[in-house]
Amino acid sequence: GSGVSNGGTEMIQLSHIRERQRYWAQDNLRRRFLEK
């Protein structure tokens, strides 16, 4: 994470990143399906 961070904020940031990646993956699949 960022320079000033403890374990708690690191875990929170990691979970946010995973949620964002999951959202983008689903969005990409949806777009690919709609384009066909």
Curated annotation (Swiss-Prot):
<keyword id="KW-0527">Neuropeptide</keyword>
<feature type="modified residue" description="Lysine amide">
    <location>
        <position position="36"/>
    </location>
</feature>
<comment type="function">
    <text>May be involved in leech reproduction.</text>
</comment>
<dbReference type="GO" id="GO:0007218">
    <property type="term" value="P:neuropeptide signaling pathway"/>
</dbReference>
<protein>
    <recommendedName>
        <fullName>Egg-laying-like hormone</fullName>
    </recommendedName>
</protein>
<keyword id="KW-0372">Hormone</keyword>
<dbReference type="GO" id="GO:0005179">
    <property type="term" value="F:hormone activity"/>
</dbReference>
<keyword id="KW-0027">Amidation</keyword>
